[in-house]
Amino acid sequence: MQDYEYIKIRELEKWKLKMKKKPSIINKASKETQNKLNSILPEQYHSIITSAIKNMTKVVLFGSKYTTKTPIINIFIEERDNLAYEKIRLYKKTAMLEGAGTGAGGILIGLADFPLLLSIKIKLLYEIASIYGFDTNDYKERIYILNIFQLAFSSQNHVNDIFKNMENFDFLKETLSNDINDFDWRKFQQEYRDYIDLAKLLQLVPGIGAFVGAYVNNKLVDKLGDYAIYSYHMRLLNSNNCIVEKESWISRQYKYIFNKKIDKKSN
């Protein structure tokens, strides 16, 4: 278990650097292209997407249908990871079948894929949160879920902003507002739409819609699952949270060495 923790801490540090990476020229160009694409998409598409995201956000913040899982406590991080990866595999299969089915149905049925996929993703995040011992009945844990969502499906510039808050979430959560109006869901929905619009648009094309739908949904859920695992590792491996097994000696040694390197660089 000690060796496993050591490996996961190293992987986590690499992932953190990726989240802090500044937008590349390609990232910036892609954002400009997406803005142009938004201007030519049909109004019906924009209306359905905006409505779906708005309703989904309300469900995440206030709904109860996703909060049925009891947080799992007193198991090792490796056991949590195994449970999480099993859930991701299950939800990937579900998303692929859903994407292939709606993609084969033409434009009108294809449009229905967006809210269905949102629901699949949110259910997966609730499952993973409980696996890592967090109670999604807590409104602020739902905010963390939305942050994971944004981290996986946003431009790099927005990822940088979101990650700053997530990295110290357990210290900042006590200062978070309980008012839904303080959450920037406009930015949330626009970033998500911009991230997947092109792929979802291709899903509406006759002949290739089913293949694109299955492939894209599989990739999106896979990425979300990985980001969720890293996001909860960041809280469990970086804290003395009581739901985590006692921190191993090798983990403490790695953190000590890593922090010493950081101190030297800063000096």
What kind of region is each of these model predictions?
Residues 1-98, 126-267:
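Terminal, membrane-proximal amphipathic helices
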Residues 110-118, 212:
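Hydrophobic alpha-helical membrane segments of integral membrane proteins
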